[in-house]
Amino acid sequence: NTPGLGDLAWTAARVAVFDGTRTSCDPQKQPGAVVKGILSPSQMPLQIRKDFGSNMNDSYWLSNPAAPLTGFAPIIGDEGTARALRTRNGLVQIEQQLAGGGKFDLARVQQFITNNRNYSAELLLPEMVTYCQANPVIDGVNVAQACSILAAWDKTENIDSIGAPLWREV
């Protein structure tokens, strides 16, 4: 890392800034790595389980919340931080399917990845509707019609889901 800006970038955002004019900043070859500049397989997260593993395009850390993966280089992903709604939604759906002995087959996986559930709506919509029904005018704006639309919404992002565009603007 470079002094000054590099130190600041690392402290603020864990972004490494290297001085490309110095050979000490060249990528090094790690033991076990095929070429220099990459990590060896032993430095990468791997999880083999009988229940499930997942990839939600988020950090490897909670591929399965029952067995968090920890201790890897920060460049691979973060640990101990809040997961994105997409990840949380996926993990909730997996747990719901597996509860009571449910399994995944091709049809269930296809349904799982195309069901268009809006997890933020699942978490927040009931309280939002209760609030706007009790307060149909907010800051001088009548929200009664919007509230009715949200109350009838199926909490999905399907093309015919009337409440979805409105929810995205809330």
Predicted segments, located by residue:
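Long, compositionally biased non-active-site segments enriched in small/hydrophobic residues and glycine
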Residues: T2-V170
